[in-house]
Amino acid sequence: MSFKDLRSFIDHLEANGELKRISYPVDPHLEMTEIADRVLRAKGPALLFENPKDHHMPVLVNLFGTPKRVAMALGKDDPLALREVGELLAFLKEPEPPRGFKDAIAKIPMFKQALNMPPKTVRNPPCQQVIKTGDEVDLTQLPIQHCWPGDVAPLVTWGLTITKGPRKSRQNLGIYRQQLLGKNKLIMRWLSHRGGALDFADFKQQFPGERYPVVVALGADPVTILGAVTPVPDSMSEYAFAGLLRGERTEVCKALSCDLEVPATSEIILEGYIDPEELAEEGPYGDHTGYYNETDKFPVFTVTHITHRKDAIYHSTYTGRPPDEPAMLGVALNEVFVPILRKQYPEIVDFYLPPEGCSYRMAVISIRKQYPGHAKRVMMGAWSFLRQFMYTKFIVIVDEDVNCRDWQDVIWAITTRMDPKRDTVMIENTPIDYLDFASPVAGLGSKMGLDATNKWEGETNREWGTPIVMDPKVKQKIDSIWDELGIDDSPTL
């Protein structure tokens, strides 16, 4: 099942008990965050606040608050099915020629999907049913959440920022938080390595002093939103990838003030520009780390047009100490990364980004070890292969007999298969998230790799321990007589 817009997905979630409407007048200032946080931690439904206090526009939160809902957004029943998305991405990153007739036949579905990429331009789009310009532009009329007591101002969190570099044929979609600065101004917090910031830097170099056109889409269809947070190959647009996932082309329309294309069924569109000379102090804000971050200067986005659907819905979220919605997205996208990593490193058995690690700061990888030093090769490869992992501070490598998603297993491997000096890799002066205040320098810090695999000859001179395992025949016998023993419940082993 595919969803043409956010509303059809909302209806689907509600029909399946995955969305709750709240008619009580809840304040976007702090109250929505407290409610959303309690519900998310209880693995509860998405929430639609129909009557936000002092506003007339409903607010949707916790849309992707469970891995199940992320899978549902892509028409899947189980988060494990998201590995199909990873297989598609692995194919697109490095398509291999067919090895023969049978292989060519097997690859036909992927080739057919790849031909269905270009977005489809439509006229009279829903996102432009209502048009506001000039003095009508007033961002304070939107029910923008003020998430935490120490936040400096309300914050736009789920906007898809659409940019285009002067030397690029494709647009970029990225999600960057935006601080409300005034009736028609937001602060665009994009870090220097992100797609939007790179496009802006190229534009400034080629057209110094000129205004840079930018568009922000709020409440796009769920597949396009997820396309913007997926590791799409640099040569492919997020619109094209969303079309692949959806099975039909993404509908777009031209913005009113520039040539950028926007998702046609979006709830709200903000159009405007960035003056390269206008910067403002952004923050502090509570972030996905569970702390308030430092302030810094970022470009100011001046909004010249607001267009939206009739009876528009404002899509929002909050970030805080895990679990939060970004952490749940990370758990779901974990399944996407597995096939991509396996294509480059077939010896990888499984890969896990624990949500407690703030979505990406720690990774655990299980491998089929084949030679001394193998674990170190894999950890180096993981750090360098995908841009998404350059901020991963800790990587733990375990053998295939260890469940890398079970902390009891992982800690057992670390404490029994590691010598701290021999099996720890430290790398200094590497890229680190600017939000990581634990690093000695903003944006630059160290990484640690932990080799918790069994050690081979060459890695140790000692006789290595053999794990204790019960005789399978004894286990089968005890299983067969368990009920006769009078012990209440058989523990899961």
From Swiss-Prot:
The active site is at D287. Mn(2+) binds at N172, E238. The keyword Lyase applies. Binds 1 prenylated FMN per subunit. One of its GO terms (molecular function) is 3-octaprenyl-4-hydroxybenzoate carboxy-lyase activity. It is found in: Cell membrane. Keywords: Cell membrane, Decarboxylase, Flavoprotein, FMN, Lyase, Manganese, Membrane, Metal-binding, Ubiquinone biosynthesis. InterPro entries: UbiD, UbiD-like_C, UbiD-like_N, UbiD_bacteria, UbiD_Rift_dom. The keyword Transferase does not apply. Pathway: Cofactor biosynthesis; ubiquinone biosynthesis. Prenylated FMN binds at I175, Y176, R177, R189, W190, L191, R194, G195. Its cofactor is prenylated FMN; Mn(2+). One of its GO terms (biological process) is ubiquinone biosynthetic process. It is an enzyme of class 4 (lyase). It is a peripheral membrane protein. Its EC number is 4.1.1.98. It comes from the Bacteria. Belongs to the UbiD family. Homohexamer. Catalyzes the decarboxylation of 3-octaprenyl-4-hydroxy benzoate to 2-octaprenylphenol, an intermediate step in ubiquinone biosynthesis. This is 3-octaprenyl-4-hydroxybenzoate carboxy-lyase.
